[in-house]
Amino acid sequence: MKIRASIRKICEKCRLIRRRRRIMVICCNSKHKQKQG
């Protein structure tokens, strides 16, 4: 899980979701997981 100020999709399978007022990226590739900090 990477924590970044600006997050974006890395591949086509990445999905932007909102959890507990935070924007996150989930993907089948676990290296693409991101959270906005």
Swiss-Prot record:
It is found in: Plastid, Chloroplast. The keyword Electron transport does not apply. GO terms for biological process: translation. Keywords: Chloroplast, Plastid, Ribonucleoprotein, Ribosomal protein. InterPro entries: Ribosomal_bL36, Ribosomal_bL36_sp. GO terms for cellular component: chloroplast; ribonucleoprotein complex; ribosome. GO terms for molecular function: structural constituent of ribosome. HAMAP family: Ribosomal_bL36 (MF_00251). Belongs to the bacterial ribosomal protein bL36 family. NCBIfam families: rpmJ_bact. This is Large ribosomal subunit protein bL36c. The gene is rpl36.
